[in-house]
Amino acid sequence: MSGYKPVAIPTYPKLGEKITQDTLYWKRYKTPVQIKEFGAVTKIHFSPVQPCTYAVTSSTRIHLYGQYSQEPIKTFSRFKDTAYCGTFRGDGKLLAAGCEDSVVQLFDISGKAALRQFSGHSKAVHFVDFTADKYRIVSGSDDYTSRLWDIPNGVEITSYNEHTDYIRCGCTSALNNDLFATGSYDHTIKIFDGRTDKSVMSMDHGQPVESVLLFPSGGLLVSAGGRYVKVWDILKGGQLLVSLRNHHKTVTSLCLSSSGQRLLSASLDRHVKVYSTMNYKVVHSFDYAASILSLALAPDDQMIVVGMTNGVLNIKHRKPEERKQLQSTTKRHPRYRVFVRGKDYMPKQDDIFISKPVIAHLKKYDKLLKGFHMTEALDTVLQPQIRNQRPEVTVAVMNELKRRGTLKNALAGRNEKQLSDLLIFLLKHLVNPQFVPILLNVAEHIIDIYSPVVGQSSVIYKQFIRLQEVLEKEINYQEELLKMLGMMDTLFATMTTKKESPWEEPKPILPLSSQ
């Protein structure tokens, strides 16, 4: 028994992960810093100017954080009820926020008391933003209205009452001082011009709208609601360009990278998706521990901040670029004494040669095979940890049992659970070209052994039906491939021109018949 050879596990080439420039770029973020807030984080907004300060709206407070601070550098708590949508002005000096008590408040970053309070809404205000000229504020409320406010005079300029449900999001144009968009739970996105008394454009998202975003150029608008992210062409009258469905739950927040070439979306499914704005394909994805309500990307893309339903603020900082040290490409050649070392050594007759014994560490299935416990060896490699993560080990043991002529005996005598596990493995890997030769033999033995009693268990019966479907599908697939191969051979044969072989004998020239 000392000459037992362990089962040889074949190795197969694996397809490596496709590494793209986006993968390398978005993976260059450090381990996240997590901060616990007082409630669910409903809004995160970065100051457009340096230093990189961002406002976090949670419960009845708005906290201001520095780029690397883990404690708030300032807190605005002058709210009677839940605060919403803390948003910086373009110069970073003022902050506006809505509240559950229907009041819009305006704060100076250097102070704590409100500079202005705009009253006019009758229900909670969930959306607040500054216009591009910095002198007006746009707000949207649960009273179905959106309003335009004058900051210097503290009065309402105009009011729009076109939505038929809660207004929960909106945005202003970075180029046009009068243009802004609102998204509502009535499934519509409406674009307003502050110089007119009604909307200039309307789009139907098809789901309650949770977030809207205007591109810096002003030509495209992105809306998020339900599981969909939709891109609209404003210059073509609100034409739908693309509808993205890459999330499994409601999409709650949107943001753009500093260059505008990447679009980020956050969802209740705990994922952040990164899209290319060239083809709107997902180029990267982040996973988080809880459902996401808010998302923001720093103006220089150095930070990603995510707010979750459990009140946790997740902050990722980008790693600094590593300086590549120039190394000499010239290898140092070994010295002369390296080559002449030991050339004069002569072994002696009384030298003792000791060889270190090699201890063979056998796997559990090898020990069972060594002891001729065939059924137990097969049961070992059918455990979920082995059959799911290393199916080649399971197939190698089956191949060894076939070589010994004991495969059929090892497959016999199984209960419902053991047979079900074996059929699950077959259904998963039977059409794998690497495993087909041995698994077809295993399938034949199982059909021969258990076909008389297959009707006694509904689970086994369904798996046998599924096995039949898999085999029929694979046979049809092979037949189609053979037909295609025949057509290709015919095409190649017709395209090939016959060339005269130099070894062929020339045809004899027959004499002309005499007149």
UniProtKB/Swiss-Prot annotation:
Subcellular location(s): the record lists: Nucleus, Nucleolus
Mention any one GO cellular component term assigned to this protein in its UniProt record. Answer: nucleolus
The UniProt keywords, alphabetically, are:
Nucleus, Repeat, rRNA processing, WD repeat
InterPro entries assigned:
U3_snoRNA-assocProt_15_C, WD40/YVTN_repeat-like_dom_sf, WD40_repeat_CS, WD40_repeat_dom_sf, WD40_rpt
Repeat (WD) positions are 36-75, 78-117, 120-159, 162-202, 204-242, 246-285, 287-326
- Looking at the record's lineage, which domain of life comes first? Eukaryota
Q: Per its record, how is this protein called by name?
A: U3 small nucleolar RNA-associated protein 15 homolog
Which organism is the protein's source? Xenopus tropicalis (Western clawed frog)
